[in-house]
Amino acid sequence: MNPRPSIAFAKFAAPQTAANRKGTVFVLSADDGGLSDAARAYDPGKTLERAFPVAEFTGKFAGVVEILAPEGTSLDRLVAIGAGKAAGLDEYAWLKLGGTIAASLRKATDVAVVLDLVGASIDGKDAANLAAGILLRSYSFDKYKTSKDKDDAKADPKKPVKITIHTADPAGAKKAFADAEAVIDGVLLARDLVNEPANILGPVEFAARAKELETLGVKVEILTEKEMKKLGMGSLLGVAQGSPRGARMAVMQWNGGKPKDGPIAFVGKGVTFDTGGNSMKPASGMEDMKGDMGGAAAVTGLMHALAARKAKANVVGIIGLVENAVDGHAQRPGDIVTSMSGQTIEVLNTDAEGRLVLADALWYCNDRFQPKFMVNLATLTGAIMVALGLHYAGLFSNNDELAERLAAAGQATQERLWRMPLGAEYDKLIDSKNADMKNIGGRYGGAIIAAQFLQRFVKDTPWAHLDIAGTAMGSPSSEINQSWGSGFGVRLLDRLVRDHYES
């Protein structure tokens, strides 16, 4: 992997210092096409501004124009980034501007960003969000490549990019960035986990990665198959029985709130590879099922983020980790298993396994911790992708307040959610003549039926299910993400905790 950029903050340079600057400089221009005085200091010959009309650069958001070796300077490149409407830049806009800068770095190793804009008041949080956008877009997963592609335009991996962001409030920016960087680290951890191949990251290895959070102050317990069997987790263990790689459950606790406060809880599906079991998936595209642990990755990344920024909340993160493989011991269609709740399940499709894992994980979480609410994340159904495409995750909930708060957090972070229905009409579709329930329903409403199944394991606890099958992996590239594994859910849930549940 290319090393992440090194980011520092400083005051605006004096004109003489700016004129003698070397390397690459980025400046911002609003939609009137004008530069601030701080930006003009790097272009005494006005070479860049003269290029605006020729390049048809108007300051439109994320537009880019650059000059190589501008006259009268020692710079290699001078680059203008369009900021659009100066007065309308929100948190996500600053992230995207940072991503645009990262995409334009090329092989630069010494970079200055002049964070000044005519018509806008830019504070420390804005600067921190721009820096966070740079880190998000700069991420790449190429650790297994032994040589660079010939057309790779990125900098030499042995020379990490040094970026200095010049702003009116460098102290405020530095403080805000420490908080933002903690969250970004959680996102990048989630991306790493989703991107890892399944031969490297199985249930045991994933559990070990979760255990590493102890260095941040997270309490981590790893339940083995023997311990889960003793607890009666027949639903989860049934999925795992076809693989020689043992199942695990990681229980993570961050106690940053008041001792008397009950915890909030997040539960993730962690199927480290999903063949479909005896209900085998088609070979085409099966390689993507290394990412079927995107929910567990998001929960692990969230716990990293909360601990790293010392969130003032008591939070539990639980991930059920299995591999759904096929051998002579694998679960068969028609098998009946007993979940930790005591409810029996007729397994009619072994490729509807994520809900079986979550059933025991949710029950265990609720039974042990009595949380204020539970939110589970899972790459659960292809049906949600048919319904919503790749830009929204499905939101199902038994609690309107929790659903509204999640939707608002999704809008604020642009990790967007769309609420889907639940109801008795759907619930009866999973009734079984041979057991308390079956793990699939009819042909229609597959994402809803999966959510109805999960609801049978949460009692009356406020609960939400996020089906992130379309957003956790293989989602469209954006200004802040070019990775196959997106890390979806970390920023969303951090925002939920930050806005509503910190003491």
Swiss-Prot record:
Highest taxon of the source? Bacteria
Entry-linked CDD domains: Peptidase_M17 (cd00433)
One GO biological process term is: proteolysis
Give the enzyme's EC designation. 3.4.11.1, 3.4.11.10
Is this entry keyworded Membrane? no
Q: Where does Mn(2+) 1 bind?
A: 274, 351, 353
What keywords would UniProt list here?
Aminopeptidase, Cytoplasm, Hydrolase, Manganese, Metal-binding, Protease
Q: Which cofactor does it need?
A: Mn(2+)
Active-site positions, per UniProt?
A: 281, 355
Q: Name one Pfam family in it.
A: Peptidase_M17_N
Asked if the Swiss-Prot or TrEMBL record annotates the protein with the keyword Heme, the reply is: no
Q: Which residues bind Mn(2+) 2?
A: 269, 274, 292, 353
Broad class of where this protein is predominantly found: cytoplasm
Q: Mention any one GO cellular component term assigned to this protein in its UniProt record.
A: cytoplasm
- Which reactions appear under catalytic activity for this entry? Release of an N-terminal amino acid, Xaa-|-Yaa-, in which Xaa is preferably Leu, but may be other amino acids including Pro although not Arg or Lys, and Yaa may be Pro. Amino acid amides and methyl esters are also readily hydrolyzed, but rates on arylamides are exceedingly low; Release of an N-terminal amino acid, preferentially leucine, but not glutamic or aspartic acids
- What protein name is recorded for this chain? Probable cytosol aminopeptidase
> To which species is this protein native?
Mesorhizobium japonicum (strain LMG 29417 / CECT 9101 / MAFF 303099) (Mesorhizobium loti (strain MAFF 303099))
**Quick one: which gene encodes this?**
pepA
